[in-house]
Amino acid sequence: MQKLISRISDYNTSMDNGKSAKKSAKITTKTGDNGTTGLLFGGRVLKSDARVEAFGTIDEAVSSLGLARALISDPEVKSIVETLQRDLFIVAAELATLEPNRDQLVETNNVVSESMVQKVEELTDSLKENLNLPNAFVVPGDSPESSAIDVSRTLIRKAERRVVALYENKHIANRDLLRYLNRASDLAYVIGRYLDREKPFNKLN
């Protein structure tokens, strides 16, 4: 997975004195100065491309979840949030790979799968067991932790909309990408409510 992340960022590895070694990540590559970015396993597209918008929004969600995780004190919830972050790296990797090159992701098990969807469903159900969710909209903002998670939820929803557009235009074929993001935003919503479970929900009447 680290190899995939480094390739997304155009990081470089090198050989030093005949031994395999990694240099410090090269942040400034200048390869994107013309407004394009490299995809995994080959190909370059404009940074304004719909595919880049999709995995860029995933990046926003991952970073937002990182802030939420830093605010959360409950170790179980922190672990769940980190699981979401790591899963979203896999989502980003698949979005950053053209369909003809997807087999290379499959070989390393770095594709979104039914098992990932099921895992998120199970995590959601486990948290819901301890909740009495209101049948109404909840106004975000009852705690810093839940507020951060709610921002993450909206970013995951935004990413889902971008991915739906890619799917409808046949740029991606894996429907589990859509299913995963839909479930992930559900999980984020439940996490937010779980964090505030000791307080009365601020419902929109």
Give names to the regions the model predicted.
Residues L4, Y11-N205:
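Phosphate/pyrophosphate-binding loop motifs in nucleotide- or prenyl diphosphate-using proteins
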